[in-house]
Structure formats: structure tokens, C-alpha cells
Swiss-Prot record:
It comes from Vibrio parahaemolyticus serotype O3:K6 (strain RIMD 2210633). Residues 25-171 are periplasmic. This is Transmembrane regulatory protein ToxS. It comes from the Bacteria. Keywords: Cell membrane, Membrane, Transmembrane, Transmembrane helix. Interacts with the C-terminal periplasmic domain of ToxR, possibly by binding and stabilizing spontaneously forming ToxR dimers. Residues 1-2 are cytoplasmic. It is found in: Cell membrane. The chain crosses the membrane at residues 3-24. Interacts with ToxR and stimulates its activity.
Length: 171
């Protein structure tokens, strides 16, 4: 009789623990912190904007690597390649970003605290003011809250509340 009661309590405990684990943010946090994640984004600008805003910018390629640490910190390094209209040359901005992260109700909340421009080259196609504006847009995008879905162990889908999705992947 005691063995049956103990077995029943153990079974209920296992079911409850499994439900708690799979239904909580813990699984998402484990997947998020288990690897370094990469993403690639290409933006094409088709609107004719005044040259004084972003200059002759017509395409942006952003490749980034991010590591979410178990202590709630994150580190991201982004390589931003800017392509001007009518030019095959590219201008590159490298940005290192640090901050805090947390998962709440399957939303990834990111709070950047430090940005460093680690670029070494100067741009011929863009003025300093235009590069500052482009960098500021990148910084604003970093502060988004995104819904996080685990597609599989190598792929995460981050869906923004206002504009599109980002896929994080690992090799």
C-alpha cells in the first residue's frame, strides 16, 4: 500500500515538474544561453529620401553574433555593411553592444547599456552625421521586445511587435 501511494505521489510530482518546466520560460532560457547565436539581415531602401538624412544609402547588410549569458548579461557584435547608390564599394560599421536580458512570458526583453563603435575605417560615401544617424537607428532597434519561439535546437524565431521577425541560428 505504501509503495502504491509513494509511486502515485512520484508520478504526480514528475507530471507537475514536467508541466512546470515545459510551460515556463526556463526551457527558452536554457536554449537561449546554451549557444552563441547568429543572425543576418538585409534591408533595401527603395524610397527616395533626401540626401541629407541617410545619404546615398540604398542597402544595409547586418551580420551579428550574440551570446546570452546565464547571469542575465548579453554581448552582441554586429558588422553593418552600408552600400551607396551607384557604388560597388561598401562602408562598414562594427558595433559592440552589452546589456541585460530576461525572458518573460515568452518575450525576450533586452536592455542595452553600452554601445561601442569598433570600426577602423572611414566612409567615403557617408558623412559623420549620416553615420551617427544610421548607428542611432541600429541602437533603437536593439531596444525592442520580441516574442521568442524555439523552432528547434539550432533556430530561434524572434517576432517584433511592430516590424517583422528575426531568425537566430547556430551552426
Amino acid at each position: 500500500m505504501k509503495i502504491k501511494v509513494a509511486s502515485a505521489v512520484l508520478a504526480v510530482s514528475i507530471l507537475f515538474s514536467g508541466w512546470l518546466y515545459w510551460g515556463s520560460d526556463l526551457k527558452v532560457e536554457q536554449v537561449l544561453t546554451s549557444n552563441e547565436w547568429q543572425s543576418t539581415m538585409v534591408t533595401v531602401i527603395t524610397d527616395n529620401l533626401p540626401d541629407d538624412t541617410v545619404g546615398p544609402l540604398r542597402r544595409v547588410n547586418v551580420e551579428s553574433n550574440v551570446k546570452y549569458l546565464p547571469n542575465g548579461d548579453y554581448i552582441r557584435v554586429a558588422n553593418i555593411k552600408l552600400f551607396a547608390q551607384g557604388s560597388t564599394a561598401e562602408s562598414t560599421i562594427n558595433i559592440s553592444e552589452k546589456g541585460r536580458w530576461e525572458v518573460s512570458d515568452n518575450y525576450l526583453l533586452v536592455s542595452p547599456s553600452e554601445f561601442k563603435d569598433i570600426s577602423s575605417s572611414q566612409s567615403k560615401d557617408f558623412s559623420e552625421a549620416q553615420l551617427r544617424l544610421i548607428t542611432q537607428i541600429f541602437k533603437l532597434d536593439a531596444e525592442q521586445s520580441r516574442r521568442i519561439d524555439v523552432v528547434n535546437e539550432k533556430t530561434l524565431l524572434l517576432t517584433s511587435l511592430n516590424h517583422g521577425s528575426t531568425v537566430l541560428f547556430r551552426n
